């Protein structure tokens, strides 16, 4: 059966978008707020109509992720910011595979996400309350699966509890995207053997987006 590289590329961009948000937060203490909203919302939407629906139904919502994906796919250097992004992306994929084989963790994750949906009736998605709740899910359910993702950045920035919560919430969104990636036929071998196909697809999607003014 032929793989749907459009859906695979969208889901992979979702992972990369989370990786980029983590990097922005760790180095600067802030990140692209619109992209963060899209990624966080993807965790809570349990019944999307399509792969694109997970990310709000618009390709533009994944602009940051698509651009990051191209950087990861075409990274010639194993050092610097692209190396960080590649490490975060691959680490999220590894953790997702561990999650998928841990039945108890999957059940707990589902229950905790249902709890988030109830909290959304009272708090904004990017409120400290929701951010802390998402971070708590990552710490309690995902981190114990190991290996832990080592986030690098500014030590002063990373000491902030608010930044720590946003980083962990972004990593949780990355796990969500990695689950989706496998559901639509994604696999790590594609990063080696289908690099050109993924690059072409990502460029095509970006080309259709309205240029930012």
From Swiss-Prot:
Cell compartments where the protein resides: Cytoplasm; Cell inner membrane
Protein family according to the UniProt entry: Belongs to the HflD family.
Location (main, coarse): cytoplasm
The encoding gene: hflD
InterPro entries recorded: HflD, HflD-like_sf
UniProt keyword annotation of Hydrolase present: no
HAMAP family per the UniProt record, alphabetical: HflD_protein
Coiled coil keyword on record: yes
GO-annotated cellular components: cytoplasm; plasma membrane
Coiled coil: 79-122
Signal peptide: none
Protein name: High frequency lysogenization protein HflD homolog
Keywords on record: Cell inner membrane, Cell membrane, Coiled coil, Cytoplasm, Membrane
Pfam families assigned to the protein according to its UniProt record, in alphabetical order: DUF489
Membrane protein topology class: Peripheral membrane protein
């Amino acid at each position: 059966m032929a793989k749907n590289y459009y859906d695979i590329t969208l889901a992979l961009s979702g992972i990369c978008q989370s990786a980029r948000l983590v990097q922005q937060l760790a180095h600067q203490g802030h990140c692209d707020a619109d992209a963060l909203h899209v990624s966080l919302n993807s965790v809570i939407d349990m019944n999307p109509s399509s792969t694109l629906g997970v990310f709000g139904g618009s390709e533009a919502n994944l602009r940051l992720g698509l651009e990051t994906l191209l950087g990861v796919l075409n990274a010639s250097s194993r050092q610097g910011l692209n190396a960080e992004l590649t490490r975060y992306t691959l680490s999220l994929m590894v953790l997702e595979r561990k999650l998928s084989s841990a039945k108890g963790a999957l059940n707990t994750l589902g229950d905790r996400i249902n709890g988030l949906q109830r909290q959304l009736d009272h708090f904004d998605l990017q409120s400290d309350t929701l951010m802390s709740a998402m971070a708590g899910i990552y710490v309690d359910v995902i981190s114990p699966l190991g290996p832990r993702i080592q986030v690098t950045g500014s030590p002063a920035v990373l000491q902030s509890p608010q930044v720590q919560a946003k980083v962990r919430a972004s990593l949780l969104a990355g796990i969500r995207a990695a689950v989706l990636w496998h559901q639509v036929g994604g696999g790590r071998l594609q990063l080696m053997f289908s690099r050109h196909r993924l690059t072409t697809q990502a460029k095509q999607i970006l080309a259709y987006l309205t240029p930012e003014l």
